[in-house]
Amino acid sequence: MTSYLSNDTEAKLKKTKELPPHIHFIGIGGIGMSALAMILAQKGYSISGSDQKKNLTLKKLEENKVHIFPTQVESNIDEILKVHGKNILVVKSSAIHRDNLELCKAKKYNLKIKHRSEILAFLIEEKKSIIVSGSHGKTTTSTYITTLFSYANKSPTAIIGGIVPLYKSNYSFGKSEFLIAEADESDGSLVKFNPNIGLITNLELEHVDHYLDLEDLIETMKQFAQKCECLITNFDCDNLRANIHGSKWFSIQKIINIDFALIPKESNGCEIIAEYYEKEKFIDVIKIPVPGIHNLSNAAAAIAACRVAGILFKDIKKGIEKLKLPSRRFEFKGLWRNRLIVEDYAHHPSEIDAAISIASTIIETKHKLSKILPRRIVTIFQPHRYSRTKKFQKEFAKTLSQSDLVFITPIYSAGEDKIEGINNKSIGHELKKIKPNLEIYTPDNNQNLIKLIKEKTLENDLILIMGAGDINLISENLFLELLNNKLISNDIAA
C-alpha cells in the first residue's frame, strides 16, 4: 500500500512562524507539558518551567538544561524577564487555574500566553502528522504507532501521554518528517489540529466536567474529524459508526467491508494470536504480545495508521513482536509477599472493566506471572474527579463487583471542589447493593489502606491498583517497605 498522503501534502507543511526564543511552561512536570518542553528544547529554544510537585520528569528536564522553578510565584516571571526580556512565551494547560500567581503576573505584564494545545498545533504544522484521539486507548495506540514506526526505521517525533517502553520516555525527537501525538478531547482543544492522518479509537461519554452529554462530545469529535486529511475510525464502536464516517475502518470483529481487520483466535492473558486482513484479503497470522481484547483493538488501529502512512506490512511486522504497553497500563510491578502487584491507569468504568477482564483471563487460563499462579482478583481503586464519580457511581460499582476483594480510596480531586455525598463510601454503598457478600473496604487515607492490604490480602492474590491520580504511590510504598526490611535482615545477618 502506498501512502494515503496526497502529493500536495508538502504545501500544508508551510513555513510556520517561529516561537519566541524563550518559552516558560507553568506546570512543566505534567506528562503532556514535559514532552512539549523537551521537543522544543531539542529544537533549540530556551526553556524554563515551574512545578510544585517533585518527580523524575523534572530531574530529566534539568539534565537537558531546562531551568526548573520548584514553586509557582510571581517572582519567577520577574526572574525570567531579567534574563530574556519581554519577548517570551508562557504556556499553560487546562489544569492551570486562572488565579495561578505566575499566570496572573504574565497577564499583568501583557506577555504572550498560549494553551499547550496551541504549541502542539504549531508542531503538527511542521510535520506529516498522525494524531490519535478517542475516549480510551489514546496513549497505548500512539505508543504502538511510535514503536512500529521506530522498528520500521522511520524515526518519528513523538509526543505521548505516557512512558513509551522503547524510549523510556514520553517523547522522541526523530529525524523523519513524521510526528505522532495524542489529541486530548478532555477540554475540546483537539479541534485546533489539522492532522494528515487522524485516528479515533472509540467514543463514549467521558470528561463530564467539560461535556454536557454524549451529543456534546460527539459534536467536538465531528469537528476534529472534519479537519483530518484522512480519518481512521473503529467500526466496532457503535457511537463512531453511527456518527462519524472515516476514510478508513478498522475492526477486530468483522472482515467484510473493513479496510484493516485483526481477528482474535487465541488468548492466554499474556498475548493474543490474530489473523490480519486488508480489504477482506487474508495477509498473515500475527502474535500481539500484550493482553486484553481492547489492546488488540489498539493494535489494529496502530497497524492501520502505519499502513495508511505508507509503511510496508513486512516492516510493520518487525515491530509487532516488540510491542509493549506504556507505563501504568496493566503494568506488572513485581511480587510483594507472594502477591502480584499490577498497576493500571483505568479511571472510567469501561477501562476498569477492561483491566479486570485481563486479570480474569490470567486466572481462568492459569497463566503464571513471575512463577505465581494467581487465584483471586483484589482491586484497589482511586476514583478520579468528583464530577466523574457522581456521573458514573453505579457503573463503577457494577464493574468493581467482578472482584473478590475491593478497596476504594478517597477521591483524587484533580483540582475539583468536593460534591456533598459523593465519596469512596458512596461507591461502596452502591457496590453492596449489587454484591452484598463482597468484602469491601473504604479507608480514609493511604496509611489505613496499606494496613488493610497487609491484613486482608492473601498469597497468590492478583492486586490490581487502578486510578489516574497518585494511587501508584501505594505500590511504591509497599515495595519500599519490602526493600527496607530486606536491608535490615541483611544487616542483622552480617
UniProtKB/Swiss-Prot annotation:
It is found in: Cytoplasm. It catalyses: UDP-N-acetyl-alpha-D-muramate + L-alanine + ATP = UDP-N-acetyl-alpha-D-muramoyl-L-alanine + ADP + phosphate + H(+). The keyword Cell cycle applies. It comes from the Bacteria. It holds the Pfam family Mur_ligase_M. GO terms for molecular function: ATP binding; UDP-N-acetylmuramate-L-alanine ligase activity. InterPro entries: Mur-like_cat_sf, Mur_ligase_C, Mur_ligase_C_dom_sf, Mur_ligase_cen, Mur_ligase_N, MurCDEF_pg_biosynth, UDP-N-AcMur_Ala_ligase_MurC. GO terms for biological process: cell division; cell wall organization; peptidoglycan biosynthetic process; regulation of cell shape. Belongs to the MurCDEF family. Cell wall formation. NCBIfam families: murC (TIGR01082). This is UDP-N-acetylmuramate--L-alanine ligase. It comes from Prochlorococcus marinus (strain NATL1A).
